[in-house]
Amino acid sequence: MMLRLLSSLLLVAVASGYGPPSSRPSSRVVNGEDAVPYSWPWQVSLQYEKSGSFYHTCGGSLIAPDWVVTAGHCISSSRTYQVVLGEYDRAVKEGPEQVIPINSGDLFVHPLWNRSCVACGNDIALIKLSRSAQLGDAVQLASLPPAGDILPNETPCYITGWGRLYTNGPLPDKLQEALLPVVDYEHCSRWNWWGSSVKKTMVCAGGDIRSGCNGDSGGPLNCPTEDGGWQVHGVTSFVSAFGCNTRRKPTVFTRVSAFIDWIEETIASH
């Protein structure tokens, strides 16, 4: 699941931690490629129940042993969810997977999120797991940036997820990764880019031939730190309704550093 802004948007349905993945991504990513298994160990698959089976709908990031951050538009109070940690190839049971049910009362969507106004922002939600994750090589915590942190233009970040391989295409079995350089607010908010649809509580990345797509929603925008680690700076929110890789329409993410206080307060009170 990923949102699309109708006149030109499409929703993509992305704590202290370990930071660095076990293998750095390839610099040859263009439209996305298979990630190295378990190289993004905070990535989760959010799945919903239908007719007795569970289906992938969004990504997310494990930010505490019993908490996941995802997109607000990924959550519906009428659905039953589970989270799968330690997932890589969804078609194969590989061993590290941890399937954790979600109680209906443990879904916390940002109070200002408005499904009918994607461009208003606040597309973020927290999920409390019914039991704590068992951390290890395949399951680790994401690092989050300091409150208010803004990435410079062209910071080389990576989107990860099981979203569609191209507009209206299939969902992949294996976790995908793609290099998405940051597009700063000055550029992304220009009239012939996203214009006023982009707010300062968002971060843009990629555009042209690289982007997120349906199924990537809620998953992380992983950005490098000076010490060689990674921080989750974005939660995948929307792309263009004209297609997942429309020129001058970078993927738009909820900027995590704008919501650190809300994240901390929500976790502390539950």
Swiss-Prot record:
Pancreas. Not detectable in keratinocytes. SUPFAM superfamilies: Trypsin-like serine proteases. The keyword Disulfide bond applies. One of its GO terms (molecular function) is serine-type endopeptidase activity. GO terms for cellular component: extracellular space. Residues 1-15 form the signal peptide. Disulfide bonds join 58-74, 117-120, 157-223, 188-204, 213-244. Keywords: Disulfide bond, Glycoprotein, Hydrolase, Protease, Serine protease, Signal, Zymogen. It catalyses: Preferential cleavage: Ala-|-Xaa. Does not hydrolyze elastin. InterPro entries: Peptidase_S1_Elastase_sf, Peptidase_S1_PA, Peptidase_S1_PA_chymotrypsin, Peptidase_S1A, Trypsin_dom, TRYPSIN_HIS, TRYPSIN_SER. It is an enzyme of class 3 (hydrolase). The active site is at residues 73, 123, 217. Glycans are attached at residue 114. Residues 29-268 form the Peptidase S1 domain. Its EC number is 3.4.21.70. GO terms for biological process: proteolysis. Residues 16-28 form a propeptide. It comes from the Eukaryota. CDD domains: Tryp_SPc (cd00190). It holds the Pfam family Trypsin. Efficient protease with alanine specificity but only little elastolytic activity. Belongs to the peptidase S1 family. Elastase subfamily. This is Chymotrypsin-like elastase family member 3B.
